[in-house]
């Protein structure tokens, strides 16, 4: 740590938003010096986003409420600095990159900030070349931002901040949008920035991956208050393993100490008997080619997805995972080949008609939310599909309950734009559930969610009456392995593997070629699990190993302790 004076000083920070009854964050104190990396972790709603807003000046300049304590940057109070000046010191990468990108092309996006500073064109061009190399996005130069995948947008958002050359980098939940190999590359980049003398604040739910950054300290928040601030080792001993995704060996150590509670979720009932469902496949792709403009993304994809299946789609950023389901919803049209739903070609069906079959949740919730209140968002779809208004209240209550939003203060009258990214993501899922679809399609369902929330709604939706199948795109390997019956593995617009999780994992070279990396839970299941058995959730596997119970095929993907 190169300098005597900290870059960041937080002294007794407490903040309560207007109309809220309780503070979002309470009595947080923290200093960050040049060259230091601080990981901020904690359950959803613990105050992480509020802390970010206080660091970058959005509190108190844009978010009003009751503020006490102080935040100082290079010795100056944030409250006394204009936002323009704060933004030159603190660069923030948002959870949802779609809300951060304003340029039509990658080059114009990278140039946007420096142009607003009045930098000469040649300086900007040189900086674009250097930043594109450092951010590993040279291959994106020349592309339109509207055609980028979610992970590619995440890297572009990071590059846009690099263009501004701030002293402090605040990065909010970047890993959910990135495949594991690209996520590791981003973490290396952040460590390089710290080694160059920058301060780095990483807010992340996926703690196991974030620890590869080797943070100097961890700030762990619970219910808005600091529970722990110190080295990684102490954090692993105090963090709630049911809310924070810890390395498996840390969970096992906690289980041996009796600190991992039994799984509180009841196992879902068996999926609908495939024989009882219409024999036609839910989705059939036959030699599908599709893309955006002149750029083809899917190259001759053929696959059949059945009702009564839970299917996870994994693969590198930009490999065609999202495009696969956009083609099913007619959000894009194949250039050749065909897509059929329940045996009928999609070209003969309208998007509204397909909405009666599929509940589709975009990767970015901002693409789905437009109404003034949460209540209006939830009633819009049922009203347009002709669902009896007398049933709306029950649909709304059930949908909010399944995604863990029912108990949020005054939730129905809140504006969706005031919700956190994680809450917006859960609201988007609730909107899809309110349509009572036959099949739920989720793009990155765990983005912005803590471990408990992601596991909870993935289990809860399986019990919805009439819901036959769940198809989800994810970079969360553990989520796929513990919840899916089947995995489709994508690479370069083609399916390179298709089968049950354990069979797909057998070819480790192919796994690595698809930018996937073994997790500690994956290795523990593979080493200790019974051959052919389902993957167990981390807490369940840890409790069994702690009790020295034999591992047999005793349970499904719910992972509940018996």
Regions found by a protein language model. Give the residues of each.
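Conserved ABC transporter NBD signature motif
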Residues: 64-76, 337-345, 354
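Helix-to-loop junction immediately C-terminal to a conserved catalytic motif
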Residues: 56, 329
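Conserved beta-strand-loop-alpha-helix hinge in the C-terminal portion
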Residues: 225-247, 494-521
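The feature captures the beta-strand-to-loop junction immediately N-terminal to the Walker
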Residues: 41-43, 314-316
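Conserved ABC ATPase signature
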Residues: 144-148, 152, 415-419
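Catalytic Walker B motif of ABC-type/P-loop ATPase nucleotide-binding domains
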Residues: 169-173, 440-443
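Conserved ABC ATPase "signature" region
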Residues: 122-140, 390-410
């Amino acid at each position: 740590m190169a300098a005597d004076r900290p870059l960041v000083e937080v002294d007794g920070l407490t903040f309560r938003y207007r109309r809220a009854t309780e503070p979002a964050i309470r009595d947080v104190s923290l200093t960050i010096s040049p060259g230091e990396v601080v990981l901020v972790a904690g359950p959803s709603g613990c105050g992480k986003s509020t802390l970010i807003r206080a660091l970058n000046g959005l509190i108190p300049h844009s978010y009003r409420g009751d503020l006490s304590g102080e935040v100082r940057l290079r010795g100056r109070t944030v409250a006394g600095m204009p936002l323009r000046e704060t933004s030159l010191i603190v660069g923030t990468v948002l959870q949802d990159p779609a809300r951060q990108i304003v340029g039509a092309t990658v080059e114009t996006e990278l140039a946007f900030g420096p142009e607003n500073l009045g930098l000469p064109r040649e300086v900007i061009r040189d900086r674009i070349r250097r930043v594109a190399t450092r951010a590993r996005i040279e291959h994106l130069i020349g592309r339109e931002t509207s055609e980028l995948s979610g992970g590619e947008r995440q890297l572009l958002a990071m590059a846009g901040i690099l263009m501004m050359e701030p002293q402090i980098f605040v990065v909010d939940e970047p890993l959910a949008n990135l495949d594991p190999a690209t996520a590791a590359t981003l973490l290396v980049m952040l460590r390089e920035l710290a080694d160059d003398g920058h301060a780095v604040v990483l807010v992340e739910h996926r703690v196991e991956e974030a620890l590869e950054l080797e943070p100097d300290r961890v700030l762990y928040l619970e219910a808005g208050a600091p529970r722990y601030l110190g080295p990684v080792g102490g954090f692993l001993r105090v963090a709630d393993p049911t809310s924070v995704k810890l390395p498996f060996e840390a969970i096992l150590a906690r289980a041996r100490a009796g600190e991992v509670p039994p799984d509180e979720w009841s196992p879902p009932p068996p999926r609908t008997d495939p024989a009882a469902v219409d024999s036609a496949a839910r989705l059939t792709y036959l030699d599908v080619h599709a893309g955006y403009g002149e750029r083809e993304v899917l190259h001759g994809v053929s696959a059949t997805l059945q009702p009564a299946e839970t299917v996870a789609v994994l693969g590198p950023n930009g490999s065609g995972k999202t495009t696969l389901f956009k083609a099913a919803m007619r959000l894009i049209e194949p250039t050749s080949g065909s897509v059929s739903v329940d045996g009928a070609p999609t070209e003969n069906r309208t998007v509204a008609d397909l909405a009666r079959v599929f509940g589709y949740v975009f990767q970015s919730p901002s693409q789905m939310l437009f109404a003034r209140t949460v209540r209006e968002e939830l009633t819009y779809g049922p009203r347009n599909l002709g669902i009896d208004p007398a049933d709306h209240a029950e649909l709304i209550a059930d949908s909010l309950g399944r995604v863990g939003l029912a108990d949020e203060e005054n939730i129905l009258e809140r504006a969706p734009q005031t919700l956190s990214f994680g809450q917006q993501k859960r609201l988007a899922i609730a909107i899809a559930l309110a349509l009572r679809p036959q099949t739920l399609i989720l793009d990155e369902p765990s983005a912005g969610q803590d471990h408990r929330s992601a596991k909870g709604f993935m289990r809860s939706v399986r019990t919805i009456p009439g819901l036959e199948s769940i198809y989800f795109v994810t970079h969360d390997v553990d989520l796929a392995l513990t919840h899916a019956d089947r995995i489709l593995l994508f690479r370069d617009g083609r399916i390179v593997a298709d089968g049950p999780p354990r069979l797909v994992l057998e070819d480790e070279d192919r796994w690595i070629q698809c930018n996937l990396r073994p997790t500690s839970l994956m290795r523990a299941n593979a080493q200790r699990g019974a051959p052919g058995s389902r993957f167990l959730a981390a807490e369940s596997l840890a409790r069994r190993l702690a009790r020295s119970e034999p591992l047999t095929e005793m349970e499904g993907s719910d992972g509940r302790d018996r």
